[in-house]
Amino acid sequence: MTMDKSELVQKAKLAEQAERYDDMAAAMKAVTEQGHELSNEERNLLSVAYKNVVGARRSSWRVISSIEQKTERNEKKQQMGKEYKMKGDYFRYLSEVASGDNKQTTVSNSQQAYQEAFEISKKEMQPTHPIRLGLALNFSVFYYEILNSPEAIAELDTLNEESYKDSTLIMQLLRDNLTLWTSENQGDEGDAG
């Protein structure tokens, strides 16, 4: 059953009142396909229908596009943080075997890379993100073993211990280091007394 022009226009008006713009556009499309010249009211209904149909899709597209851009930026930042962490790791490994001025340079490079990774991870990652936890572990090892600094213990002691599957192993390693280093420090204090 095909509707005549006046029924389709009435259907479009009802669809507009119900804010069903896809139905409104379909009704007005059917009016135009009949081949008759459109009145001002019909042209207005057609315009309103398509403006709202397209507007809703444009709005949805903007939201999706914005989310994609934020996600891409976040992924790039996380990747950058991971790469700085790796750079810090490799310079730390070099500083373990270097000597003299070369050791100072590798220690400095390692610390700079870890610090960059740390700043990025604070802004871009959750506290329990595996990369951020791995960074905390390796940076604390750097402080304790390379710089011989007790700051590593204080840093590890402030970590939040939420249980996330990917983070559990790293958090256990952090806890093991804290226990080991605390017992070593207590042993050193006992020897001094």
Curated annotation (Swiss-Prot):
The modification N-acetylthreonine is found at T2. The modification Phosphoserine is found at S60, S149, S183. GO terms for biological process: negative regulation of G protein-coupled receptor signaling pathway. Pfam families: 14-3-3. PROSITE patterns: 1433_1, 1433_2. The modification 3'-nitrotyrosine is found at Y84. The modification N-acetylmethionine is found at M1. GO terms for cellular component: melanosome. The record marks R58, R92 as: Interaction with phosphoserine on interacting protein. There is a cross-link at K51 (Glycyl lysine isopeptide (Lys-Gly) (interchain with G-Cter in SUMO2)). PANTHER family: 14-3-3 PROTEIN. Homodimer. Interacts with SAMSN1 and PRKCE. Interacts with AKAP13. Interacts with SSH1 and TORC2/CRTC2. Interacts with ABL1; the interaction results in cytoplasmic location of ABL1 and inhibition of cABL-mediated apoptosis. Interacts with ROR2 (dimer); the interaction results in phosphorylation of YWHAB on tyrosine residues. Interacts with GAB2. Interacts with YAP1 (phosphorylated form). Interacts with the phosphorylated (by AKT1) form of SRPK2. Interacts with PKA-phosphorylated AANAT. Interacts with MYO1C. Interacts with SIRT2. Interacts with the 'Thr-369' phosphorylated form of DAPK2. Belongs to the 14-3-3 family. This is 14-3-3 protein beta/alpha. It comes from Ovis aries.
